[in-house]
């Protein structure tokens, strides 16, 4: 599969506990998000990175890698979900925000080597470690070092295409938002096929770890800008 490092909009490391409870407001529209970036509450990190994400609590600990994948990994989502009124409204809201609010959860066939690589990344200091009201702890490590990025990319390149493991309505809304933005770009004659909205940020979890239900990265913790605002 194709899964690449990406530039991220995320909470400032020292203000994450302030930012996460305010995400409904911060991500209410692009103006509010711009204000949070100006204020220093949110950080627009321009350098591409992979992120290792771990959540622990009941029923255990799950580790995944966060990357951007071509948005067509979301095609073939539940047709009923794709055509629902709620999905269409959510797609319009995401297209207007111009930011994907949280990674979509996908399952993939991980290799033992990938487990070792991600385990090594987790030996460093974490970027975030926060516990939510449900008692689940979310940890994130940023992977920017060239050799580590290359190792993760090589493993993901060898993996089969991932499968959806998220709410079908959310996955369909992301695909719908990408389509709306692509239609807009085609209308004005600027579409190239390389725009950020042609990619979706995904939390990739080993299939074996999510058979009983896949976790979700908290909204706003790792977001992906899909169009200029």
Task: List where the protein language model places each region.
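Surface-exposed, charge/polar-rich loops and edge strands
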Residues: 1-162, 167-229
